[in-house]
């Protein structure tokens, strides 16, 4: 199985933690969940100046400015799509939705076929990407 985490900082933490500190926190949270998903790690920090995507090891953001209001992350045990295309968090093309997911969708091929008939284009073979588009639909 994979591991997922979410962090919603208090108002004070938002003021005290810049993107550099949050990227370090994301790295620590990913490390704590490494036993749940040894194949890949990723996270997304939602700040007032946009979304910062992170990988492991966390890299410093281009801008250290911005207050983070939400941090989502995932450690991955690759089962269905073993390629890097299955890296999470997944983001919808319009940027409206972000998904971290732990589990397996057994009927994802049928769901994917239905969504493709409705014009959705997938970048991976991962069941998690199917879930993202199904929820956005």
Set out the residue ranges of the language-model regions.
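N-terminus-centric sequence/structural signature that marks the extreme N-terminus
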Residues: 1-137
């Amino acid at each position: 199985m994979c591991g997922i985490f979410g962090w919603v900082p208090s108002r004070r933490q938002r003021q005290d933690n810049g993107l550099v500190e949050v990227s370090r926190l994301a790295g620590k949270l990913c490390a704590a969940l490494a036993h749940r998903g040894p194949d890949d790690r990723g996270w997304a920090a939602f700040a007032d100046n946009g979304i910062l995507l992170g990988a492991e090891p966390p890299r410093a953001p281009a801008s250290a400015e911005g207050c983070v209001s939400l941090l989502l992350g995932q450690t991955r045990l690759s089962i269905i799509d073993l390629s890097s295309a299955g890296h999470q968090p997944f983001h919808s093309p319009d940027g409206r939705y972000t998904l971290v997911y732990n589990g397996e969708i057994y009927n994802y091929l049928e769901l994917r076929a239905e969504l493709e008939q409705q014009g959705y284009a997938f970048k991976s073979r991962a069941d998690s990407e199917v879930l993202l588009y199904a929820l956005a639909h």
